[in-house]
């Protein structure tokens, strides 16, 4: 029975992530890049400056940096470690090239999401801020498109409960913990008709309890936790990736060549082991969206809470999230995997990246495994926290503000975290891809439809910027 369900999930994943959606995703990014005049290149230095410089005044609940960290806490997760590995294993090294392409054009859509999030956000009487694609669809496109906003909100709840928010993250955590403490599965117990390591069960329970303690604190607590953890864990992970690349620098040119050649001729790199260009594109773009969430529509939910009065400023800050997540962190992971050859030895999931760390770093394998486990636990945990916030905001809009529904969602979310470790790696990633595609579609329609608004806001902002020095 479970095998048939997995086969159906895999078929649905392939159907949704077919050529039409891939073309639409790339076309929307190219369209916004052209309309904005390559803003992701021209204004990246200013965006990085705004990222750490808070703006005074404006409505909102957290600083722009806090909103970015909340968004990064939801994007920097298993996608950076496990997602890249699954993409390279299934699509070959060329999948990383398509992740870069998706990220480059995704920066333009991420900028657009940030602009629209601030422009169309809703300020409640008590100062509480609500925003995201459902609001810029309804307010920007008109009431007749409210059904599209509701559709986005529904799929957003599903992504949180069954995809990026829970299953993939806690599955990644439990796998990393198992690889470190019980790699040979010597200590197992029969549960749900299958054998599981005790470490998997213990990890699931601990993560579920920790998540429950934090998410009951609301956005303020999530922002506080993520502002401390996200920069620290990202730096630690990048440092060890740089060390690995430094110790194996001679292999970098060949790895880059394999990535570029594999993007257009996968068989030449993989020897026919891995599929076609279409698979490399599909895996690269799908995992790229999973990782950086550009086009997904999740980040503008957090961006709407930023204390700012300038939509374009927040758009620039939001754009840096994709740069940090994919261009920096995912690239590091991908290069480590390709250089060490861990992608084509029959492993899957976190085991691929673990093998890369063990083979590429001049440390005891246990130390390398511990480093990766620690990074993955922090990455995935903060992603779980960020996606609870996203899911709650989606439900809040979908249910018309029912706080009872939100409370029920929180407990269902915690329950999903508890059950996540007991699913297969392939199943959790296929389910995540399915809901990601369904969630991205309404958001992309809105971005293209409101592209004129984004361009006008951008022109007006930079015109005023030349005249004033305080924005």
Q: Predicted regions span which residues?
A:
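Transmembrane helix-loop junctions in multi-pass membrane proteins
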Residues: 5, 36-40, 79-84, 160-173, ...
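Membrane-interface loop-to-helix entry segments
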Residues: 24-31, 35-48, 152, 170-177, ...
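Extracellular/periplasmic helix-exit of transmembrane alpha-helices
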Residues: 33, 113-120, 125, 241-258, ...
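Flexible loop linkers connecting adjacent transmembrane helices
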Residues: 38-64, 86-96, 100, 108-144, ...
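Alpha-helical membrane segments and immediately flanking helix-loop junctions
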Residues: 57-90, 116-140, 151-154, 158, ...
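Membrane-interface alpha-helices at helix entry/exit sites of multi-pass transporters
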Residues: 57-61, 92-101, 139, 143-151, ...
